[in-house]
């Protein structure tokens, strides 16, 4: 019967053209908007993970209470041992220590007097021992001038802050901050390159420094602000599962320096942002399909009037009502399948 109905639809375009056109257009627009919003959500998660949240994040209980301030004086200690233990317990997760700090970037003249000065946000990442951070942060693609650091004492600065302070490649700059214990810290660094990520928060005043230099600068030997964990591919359910197991083992609410693992979705405003995107996608699909259903319903009513005579003839020659009804349903299914294939291709 399907073959017979398919031939009929192909030969009589008036029965199939407009329904297929309407359904194909609706499917195409629904898939297009859903794919765009899904892609935006994936990119949001990707950008958040690589710059700040990781897929999971380990911090101290006290740090978590003030996490928006990034208080590295409440950070993790004995980080190398912790990462070794984590790698054994969660071999599928790649662990990276990070140090976030703020300070003043000072450009001195030949006499050591200040030429220009501005606030910067420092990122202490592992630049030398492996290439994971290079790939994660896309440093080679983000590089706009100069080269990546090849030795200790070299740093990357955002192109915007470089232009603002009139800093050139190979200039020696001074970063002024405070150590983990609250005393003043100053150290000189050589600008090896300039970067532009296309992310406003980073481009406004980011400084990328190797974590070993930051540890020496801030008196944070074998310490880190946070430890970020990255799965091979982001899996929200798995991040919650890993966090639950870790927190049941290591987290003590009464100990301010006990470690707590936080999945990406529950960090900052991510829960609200992701939930809002999901609700927008669901609402759009529901509303659009509902409107398309009304249009098709109206089209079906008009078609019913048109084929009224045809149905009467079929009944008159002895065709059963059930057979006619089933053939109309099969015809609708064929139109829906054809339109869906056209709309998604």
Where are these regions (language model features)?
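Membrane-interface helix starts
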Residues: 9-25
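Transmembrane helix boundary and interhelical loop/hinge segments in multi-pass membrane proteins
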Residues: 13-15, 303-312
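Small-residue faces within membrane-embedded alpha-helices
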Residues: 24-35, 39, 289-292, 303, ...
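Alpha-helical transmembrane segments
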Residues: 28-58
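Peri-transmembrane interface segments
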Residues: 36, 233, 238-293, 303-305
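A structural signal for hydrophobic secondary-structure junctions
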Residues: 61, 71-208, 212-222
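Structural beta->alpha junctions
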Residues: 66-67, 73, 196-198, 229-238, ...
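Transmembrane alpha-helical interface segments in multi-pass membrane proteins
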Residues: 301, 310-345
């Amino acid at each position: 019967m399907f073959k017979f109905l398919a031939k009929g639809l192909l030969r009589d375009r008036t029965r199939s053209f407009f329904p297929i056109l309407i359904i194909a257009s609706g499917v195409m627009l629904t898939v297009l908007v859903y794919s765009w919003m899904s892609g935006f959500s994936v990119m949001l998660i990707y950008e958040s993970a690589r710059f700040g949240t990781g897929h999971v994040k380990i911090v101290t209980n006290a740090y978590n209470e003030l996490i928006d301030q990034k208080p590295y004086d409440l950070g993790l200690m004995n980080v190398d041992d912790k990462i070794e233990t984590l790698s054994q317990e969660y071999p599928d997760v790649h662990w990276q220590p990070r140090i976030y700090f703020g300070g003043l970037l000072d450009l001195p003249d030949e006499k050591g007097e200040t030429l220009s000065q501005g606030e910067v946000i420092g990122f202490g990442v592992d630049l030398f021992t492996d290439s994971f951070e290079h790939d994660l942060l896309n440093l080679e693609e983000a590089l706009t001038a100069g080269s990546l650091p090849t030795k200790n004492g070299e740093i990357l600065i955002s192109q915007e802050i470089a232009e603002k302070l009139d800093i050139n490649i190979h200039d020696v700059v001074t970063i002024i901050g405070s150590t983990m214990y609250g005393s003043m810290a100053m150290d000189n660094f050589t600008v090896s390159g300039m970067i532009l990520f296309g992310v406003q928060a980073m481009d406004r005043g980011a400084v990328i420094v190797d974590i070993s230099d930051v540890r020496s600068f801030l008196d944070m030997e074998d310490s880190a602000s946070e430890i970020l964990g990255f799965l091979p591919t982001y899996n929200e359910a798995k991040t919650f599962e890993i966090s639950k197991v870790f927190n049941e083992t290591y987290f003590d609410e009464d100990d301010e320096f006990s470690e707590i693992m936080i999945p990406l979705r529950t960090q900052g405003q991510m829960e609200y942002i992701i939930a809002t995107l999901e609700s927008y996608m669901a609402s759009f699909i529901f509303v659009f399909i509902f409107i398309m259903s009304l249009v098709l319903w109206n089209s079906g009513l008009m078609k019913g009037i048109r084929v009224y005579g045809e149905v009467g003839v079929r009944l008159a020659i002895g065709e059963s009502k059930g057979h006619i009804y089933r053939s109309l349903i099969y015809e609708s299914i064929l139109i829906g399948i054809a339109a869906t294939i056209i709309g998604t291709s």
